């Protein structure tokens, strides 16, 4: 046990390890807050589609040699989030068809561009890191950490500020409309915030594993609690603890950060599911 703590203490002497833990906790908190809303509104598929869009945008940013690629990826992902939300309300283009079209197209174009215009000698490694977050969170600069921190604070502030409206739109959108709530505006706000979370989470778990970071804590909390507030708070706690444990385990064992965090999330869900079955929840 003492050797384990000595190893962790040694690693935490390096700034990039501290940056990884800070960003991991912030992203886990943000993703869990909106994850409950996405699951209840059946918007989970939007997160998966936007993660592929973010991958394509990252490929374009690398081709254009954009230094801070997050400033390019973020607006592109937000625009696509708005489009997907509008597509879901379009009777001609079904929402699931639009998401499948955009996600697969963005993934294919992104990989094609990385092969055609890549300046890196290790394309496979770059793609693996982008898709699964194997090393990208360990290469964060101080500027990127500050950007993640600022965006995370904005996301949490938006959720707290509009909590009642988000709650109303989540549980009964038709009633919320009848009560005078601008449901379309708040659905748009949710989509934009999710786009921001997707971009932030790419460095943590990679574009293919982002949905797990959003969905698993919410599902785990729903097995144990019933009220929206309790589920949201417990999902946030589970997500932060899972991210922290995943990062620490990956440091000690040498496993990929993103996959380890998702594995911990899965373990927490299985435990929650078992407790829910035993208690009859």
Regions found by a protein language model. Give the residues of each.
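Short loop segments and helix-boundary regions at transmembrane helix junctions
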Residues: 36-51, 55-121, 221-233, 250-254, ...
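Helix-loop-helix "hairpin" substructures at the membrane interface of multi-pass membrane proteins
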Residues: 140-217
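Transmembrane helix-bundle core of multi-pass membrane transporters
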Residues: 7-10, 103-160
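Cytosolic-side transmembrane-helix boundaries in multi-pass membrane proteins
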Residues: 255-262, 266-281
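Alpha-helical transmembrane segments in multi-pass membrane proteins
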Residues: 23-31, 57, 61, 72-80, ...
